[in-house]
């Protein structure tokens, strides 16, 4: 059992979506005490070829310098910061400039090859924040309360199939195309049937988490010319098991639910906001409406700005 949520401001302007998502996820804390995560879109304000790297580094002498040297082989480092974290690790965040998006994944793999270092994400149009602990602990550690954006997705995790650490927390990201993220509640029971064709196409999996499989599946469909709605509709046909998930893109969010409707999901909207979550109590954190709609079995919905 996990909690998922998404919120989109219809005017496409910057709003306090970090605070909104923090409250929405806190209302779902009972669904997942292990870890929590956010993908906040639209607020980074990076230049066209700039990316933000989010890197977990063990706190030991010389290791951060090695990470910086590896990054600088590809790009000069712009602004950067070190966020003290937990369990003898730090989070190193830095802005880089690349000639093309195709350079991003190879750079991440080079950084990941350093012992005791792992890249949590690299993005252009969204900021990813995820860690172990409660929603409010993470919110205070990374100051999600102050984050501005146009839309966001988030997750509270109750682990059932993989280890509990910062890297396995949701959202998951794919580098097949830029800035695609997924949060997920449930299990994909035909995981290997979905994964193996993607690997044969050259897509690289870093974990055995089925959420990573979903995000690569959706990104692969988008790269093949599917619309987001078409990709989600095909996923409902192809994937087995109980699931509901939310995908984040630079343009908005998409929602999909398994054909038997075995995982909860509700949505609502008013003139300003569209929101979706595992439970109604989460929606109430961002709007006051009596018109809450249940997501039907097999339903797909896309809301883009």
Curated annotation (Swiss-Prot):
Pfam families found in the cross-reference section: GATase_6 (PF13522)
Protein name listed in UniProt: Putative glutamine amidotransferase MTH_191
Keyword GTP-binding: no
Glutamine amidotransferase type-2 domain segment(s): 2-305
E.C. number: 2.4.2.-
PROSITE patterns hit by this protein: GATASE_TYPE_2 (PS51278)
Main enzyme class: transferase
UniProt entry keywords in alphabetical sequence: Glutamine amidotransferase, Transferase
Keyword Nucleus recorded: no
A GO molecular-function descriptor: transferase activity
SUPFAM superfamilies: N-terminal nucleophile aminohydrolases (Ntn hydrolases)
Residues at the active site: 2
């Amino acid at each position: 059992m996990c909690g998922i949520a998404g919120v989109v401001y219809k005017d496409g302007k910057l709003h306090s979506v970090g605070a909104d998502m923090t409250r929405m996820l806190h209302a779902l804390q009972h669904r997942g005490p292990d870890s929590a995560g956010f993908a906040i879109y639209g607020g980074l304000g990076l230049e066209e070829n700039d990316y933000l790297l989010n890197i977990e580094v063990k706190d030991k002498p010389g290791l951060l310098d090695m990470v910086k040297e590896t990054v600088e082989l590809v790009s000069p480092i712009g602004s950067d910061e070190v966020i003290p974290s937990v369990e003898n690790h730090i989070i190193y965040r830095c802005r880089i400039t690349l000639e093309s998006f195709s350079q991003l994944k190879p750079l991440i793999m080079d950084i990941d090859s350093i012992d005791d270092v792992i890249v949590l994400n690299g993005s252009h149009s969204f900021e990813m924040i995820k860690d172990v602990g409660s929603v409010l602990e993470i919110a205070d550690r990374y100051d999600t309360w102050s984050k501005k954006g146009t839309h966001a997705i988030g997750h509270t995790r109750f682990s059932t199939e993989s280890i509990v650490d910062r890297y396995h927390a949701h959202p998951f990201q794919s580098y097949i195309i830029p800035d695609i993220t997924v949060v997920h509640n449930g299990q994909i029971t035909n995981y290997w049937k979905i994964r193996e064709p993607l690997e044969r196409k050259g897509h690289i999996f870093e974990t055995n988490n089925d959420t990573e499989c979903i995000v690569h599946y959706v990104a692969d469909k988008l790269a093949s010319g599917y619309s987001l709605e078409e990709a989600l509709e095909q996923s409902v046909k192809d994937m087995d098991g109980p699931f509901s998930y939310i995908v984040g893109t630079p343009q908005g969010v998409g929602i999909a639910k398994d054909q038997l409707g075995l995982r909860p999901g509700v949505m609502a909207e008013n003139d300003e906001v569209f929101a979706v979550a595992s439970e109604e109590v989460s929606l109430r954190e961002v709007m006051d409406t009596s018109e809450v709609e249940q997501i039907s079995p097999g339903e797909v919905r896309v809301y883009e700005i």
